[in-house]
Amino acid sequence: MTHFEEAELTSLIDWRKSCKEDGLSFSLSAYFIKTLVIALKEHPIFNSTLDEKNDVIRLHDDYHIGLATNAPDGLIVPVLKHADQKSILQIDEEMKELTRRAQNNELKGEDLRGGTFTISNVGPLGSIGATPIINAPQTALLAIHKTKRRPVVTKDDQIAIGEVMTMSMSFDHRIADGAQAVAFTNRWVEMLEDPKRLVLELI
């Protein structure tokens, strides 16, 4: 099953620009992963795998995020290990290194094993929507699509131009249901649309 959602990122983009002016440069993808881990901790069913042989759902205490990446020989999914223990800057640095190694065919087997949840950022390719394929035996895969400038209604009921990103999450309906998926993405969207929420989570 696939659930579709969107997030208005103007506040996040402005905050990232402010951080860059202060000498802290990082990709939006790194912020996505940092906040995604917080949402996964609150909704652990999505940080699980299905052991079909033993008919058991295994919840994981480790947060190993698979990064769907274009490589010379096709799609590959290196794994960012222990994402919950890393800062946004550390995540950004490790993501760039894993991507570089993937594009240069330098990944080792251990770099591809152990993922508990996968994220695919296809926005730079121009995608505005798709039904992603789950990286079994994981429970879900989240695809991030293109951010587009669109008219939005602000909190004070004004019309403004916003930076709207669409996303789609496919999940194994044997493990999680639609209500759980909506609650999970709603929590993540809260932190995307209001980056101050991340600060509150880390206090």
Language-model segments: which ranges?
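C-terminal catalytic/motor cores of large multi-domain enzyme assemblies
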Residues: 1-203
